[in-house]
């Protein structure tokens, strides 16, 4: 049996972010010039590295591995203290001892996606050919590129077939891509709050964020690391705009309403008079301490390009035809970023392709981010699906 634990290290500050890009506080799988990653844009990326975390114990026949695919601005630190923020892991509602993704039962892997900034090769990494940060010289990547890199990592770990692939939002897109690109390697899959392609509205929101970043003079055409001035203002605005889409009108009303921030009367200025304004400003300012602006451009573009049906003559069901993977598709009633009809389209395509699929629409007012929050119905659904799949896979409560 192989027992692998996450690497622990000191909590970093925002100023150490470039160090995480090349030398992450994580496990690292390095791939040399003889193991290139073929990208959809036609470039062979080599050498490159993947930063990842693992939790739990891989059983003797390597049949209890779960791959968790993270969302856009998350990373591999889903169940351990984050090395930059010092905050708890990003998905502790779902991952950990006794949780639905039970680390006492399963061997859990989460890798930082290619193109991000927490240790996997991306625009914030050093280009070995120049000795400088890649910046916009880094090739444009796609969701399939991310999944191919993950498959290389899974190969490196000696795992032929994953018990389950789980993820929400951009992570859910990766789950769907895994099930299409490597159906024989995925026993079960749980795509959450996602779609098989990005809508025009979501592309528009992403373009708004990208333009905010690129309009910041400190962006310097992507060469801000060389100038020493980072486009924090533009990236903060991008984060503020995106964060609104992760919530719902009901959630904002319940949490903030029109309540004032530390005052009883308006200031008749452009200060943050309302609590919701102060909250958004905090979301923007805290985000820039842990995320790279160019990575934000690259990952949002990857989501925009995602379209499973495009590679199957526009017929989505053809992508899933003959799959033996067991699916559980989950949506949330107040999610207007990836509304329930998007999930129903996935279910219809899976049904047409002859797949085994269950579907759950969770009643909640928490919006898109509900999949990351303490949402009891969703947690119960995840637990039940994984337990059922584990029984079908022949895994006992100890993951053997």
Swiss-Prot record:
Where are the active-site residues found?
169 (nucleophile), 335, 368
| Annotated Pfam families | Abhydrolase_1
- Provide the protein's localization: Cytoplasm
Q: Where is this region: Disordered?
A: 1-22
Does Transferase show up as a keyword for this record? yes
Transmembrane segment boundaries? none
Q: Domain AB hydrolase-1: where?
A: 64-374
Instruction: Identify the enzyme class.
Output: transferase
Pathway as given in its UniProt record: Amino-acid biosynthesis; L-methionine biosynthesis via de novo pathway; O-acetyl-L-homoserine from L-homoserine: step 1/1
Has keyword Transmembrane helix?
no
Predominantly, its location class is cytoplasm
* Alphabetized UniProt keyword annotations: Acyltransferase, Amino-acid biosynthesis, Cytoplasm, Methionine biosynthesis, Transferase
Q: Name one GO biological process term.
A: methionine biosynthetic process
Binding site residues for substrate: 239, 369
Output a single Gene Ontology CC term carried by this record: cytoplasm
Example GO molecular function? homoserine O-acetyltransferase activity
Please state the Enzyme Commission number of this protein: 2.3.1.31
Catalytic activity reported: L-homoserine + acetyl-CoA = O-acetyl-L-homoserine + CoA
The cross-references to InterPro entries, in alphabetical order and at most eight, read: AB_hydrolase_1, AB_hydrolase_fold, HAT_MetX-like
State the superkingdom.
Answer: Bacteria
Q: Which family does it belong to?
A: Belongs to the AB hydrolase superfamily. MetX family.
Q: What is this protein's function? A: Transfers an acetyl group from acetyl-CoA to L-homoserine, forming acetyl-L-homoserine.
Relate the assembly described in the record. Homodimer.
The protein here is known as Homoserine O-acetyltransferase
């Amino acid at each position: 049996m192989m027992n692998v634990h996450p690497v622990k290290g000191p909590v970093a500050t925002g100023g150490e972010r470039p160090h995480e890009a090349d030398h992450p506080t994580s496990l690292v799988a390095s791939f040399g010039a003889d193991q290139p990653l073929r990208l959809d844009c036609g470039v062979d990326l080599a050498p490159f590295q993947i930063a990842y975390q693992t939790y739990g114990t891989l059983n003797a026949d390597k049949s209890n591995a779960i791959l968790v695919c993270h969302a856009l601005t998350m990373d591999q630190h889903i169940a351990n203290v984050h090395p930059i923020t010092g905050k708890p892991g990003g998905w502790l509602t779902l991952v950990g001892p006794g949780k639905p993704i039970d680390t006492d039962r399963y061997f859990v892997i989460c890798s930082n996606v290619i193109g991000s900034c927490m240790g996997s090769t991306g625009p914030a990494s050093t280009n070995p050919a120049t000795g400088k940060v890649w910046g916009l010289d880094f090739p444009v990547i796609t969701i399939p590129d991310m999944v191919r890199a993950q498959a290389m990592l899974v190969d490196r770990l000696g795992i032929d077939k994953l018990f389950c692939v789980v993820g929400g939002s951009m992570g859910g897109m990766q789950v769907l891509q895994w099930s299409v690109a490597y159906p024989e390697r995925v026993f079960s899959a749980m795509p959450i709050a996602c779609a098989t392609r990005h809508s025009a509205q979501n592309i528009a929101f992403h373009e708004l964020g990208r333009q905010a970043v690129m309009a910041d003079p400190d962006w310097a055409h992507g060469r801000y690391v060389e100038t020493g001035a980072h486009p924090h203002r533009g990236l903060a605005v991008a984060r503020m705009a995106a964060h609104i889409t992760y919530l719902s009108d009901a959630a904002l009303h319940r949490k903030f309403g029109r309540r004032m921030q530390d005052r009883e009367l308006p200031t008749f200025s452009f200060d943050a008079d309302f609590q919701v304004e102060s909250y958004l400003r905090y979301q923007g300012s805290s985000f820039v301490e842990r995320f790279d602006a160019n990575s934000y451009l690259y990952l949002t573009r990857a989501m925009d390009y995602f379209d499973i049906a495009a590679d199957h003559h526009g017929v989505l069901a053809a992508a899933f035809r003959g799959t033996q993977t067991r699916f559980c598709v989950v949506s949330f009633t107040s999610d207007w970023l990836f509304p329930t009809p998007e999930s129903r389209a996935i279910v219809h395509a899976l049904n047409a392709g002859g797949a085994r699929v269950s579907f759950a629409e969770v009643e909640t007012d928490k919006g898109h981010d509900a999949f990351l929050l303490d949402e009891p119905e969703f947690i119960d659904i995840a637990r039940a699906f994984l337990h059922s799949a584990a029984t079908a896979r022949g895994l006992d409560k100890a993951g053997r």
